[in-house]
Amino acid sequence: MAATPVPTALGAYRLLLRATRIAFHGDFTTLHAARAEARKQFDQHRELGVDTPMRIQHAVETAEILRTNVVQGIKVSDAGEDTDRYELRIHEHIERGDNDTIKTAGKNKKVKVAVGKTCSNTQS
């Protein structure tokens, strides 16, 4: 079984830029701001250090979150409506979950989530 390759700083940076392009497609202002922030963070930590592998891993994880969990909404203005409506741009990379926790919570069961725990560590 082959080990997962560890990306270089340049590879992580390019992965982050691709993720911003996917997540913020059509929103030039946010796309530009996200890319500027990524560049600023990489420029600030240009020198190799003890924490370089952690920073590279952080960039890879950030790219994954941007690509799979960020959904943008565009405000749709229809004449005659009193409420605000948004059209969501859901693309093929968005992580789609199941509704198992909603179904079990609807049966008088409470899903407990402790502070500091992730969804994968919850107990029902």
From Swiss-Prot:
Keywords assigned by UniProt, alphabetized: Chaperone, Mitochondrion, Transit peptide
**GO terms (BP aspect):** mitochondrial respiratory chain complex III assembly
Question: Where does it reside?
Answer: Mitochondrion matrix
Q: What are its GO cellular component terms?
A: mitochondrial matrix
A molecular function annotated in GO for this UniProt entry is: protein folding chaperone
Domain of life, per UniProt, equals Eukaryota
Q: Which family does it belong to?
A: Belongs to the complex I LYR family. MZM1 subfamily.
How it assembles, according to the record, is:
Interacts with RIP1.
Q: What does this protein do?
A: Assembly factor required for Rieske Fe-S protein RIP1 incorporation into the cytochrome b-c1 (CIII) complex. Functions as a chaperone, binding to this subunit within the mitochondrial matrix and stabilizing it prior to its translocation and insertion into the late CIII dimeric intermediate within the mitochondrial inner membrane. Modulates the mitochondrial matrix zinc pool.
Name used for this protein in its record = Mitochondrial zinc maintenance protein 1, mitochondrial
**Which organism is this entry from?**
Blastomyces gilchristii (strain SLH14081) (Blastomyces dermatitidis)
This chain is encoded by the gene named MZM1
